[in-house]
């Protein structure tokens, strides 16, 4: 009986650790999806910019709290794109779109790996819970034995 209780404590601890890891992975997955959506929006914006015939189109520049300023795109053939670590480079719109497509593929890979890891953790959580339940059932059955 004491051995069973120690095993249950161990399983409970393992379950808590796995739950914490799963929660972190779920949060990471959410952040990856948000970042991917932002990159997708930028890519679509650049693709739409290419379709505009005006040389210097007028735009609305967001300044926060749902407020905007009117602006003019001075150079619609080039975009300044973040390359990470606080650095940005100027690229042609076509190059910027290609760069963003690569970044989207990287996000897709990271999302897929994170989903797989989360699925694996959820399976392990189920296995640990099942094992704990089996031990509890054995303990319950042991206490109901009829003596002759």
UniProtKB/Swiss-Prot annotation:
Sample GO molecular function, one term: unfolded protein binding
Cellular compartments annotated: Cytoplasm
Signal peptide: none
GO biological process: protein folding
Keyword Chaperone recorded: yes
Top-level taxonomic group: Archaea
CDD domains documented for this protein: Prefoldin_alpha_GimC
Assembly information from the UniProt record: Heterohexamer of two alpha and four beta subunits.
NCBIfam families, alphabetized: prefoldin subunit alpha (TIGR00293)
Protein name: Prefoldin subunit alpha
């Amino acid at each position: 009986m004491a051995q069973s209780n120690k095993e249950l404590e161990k399983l409970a601890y393992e379950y808590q650790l796995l739950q914490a890891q799963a929660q972190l992975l779920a949060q990471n997955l959410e952040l990856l999806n948000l970042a991917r959506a932002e990159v997708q929006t930028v890519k679509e914006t650049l693709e739409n910019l290419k379709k505009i015939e005006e040389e210097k189109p007028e735009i609305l520049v967001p300044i926060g709290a749902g407020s905007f300023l009117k602006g003019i795109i001075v150079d619609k053939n080039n975009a300044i794109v973040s390359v990470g670590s606080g650095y940005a480079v100027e690229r042609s719109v076509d190059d910027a779109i290609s760069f963003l497509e690569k970044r989207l593929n990287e996000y897709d890979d990271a999302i897929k790996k994170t989903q797989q890891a989360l699925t694996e953790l959820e399976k392990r959580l189920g296995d640990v819970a099942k094992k704990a339940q089996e031990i509890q059932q054995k303990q319950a059955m042991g206490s109901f034995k009829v003596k002759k």
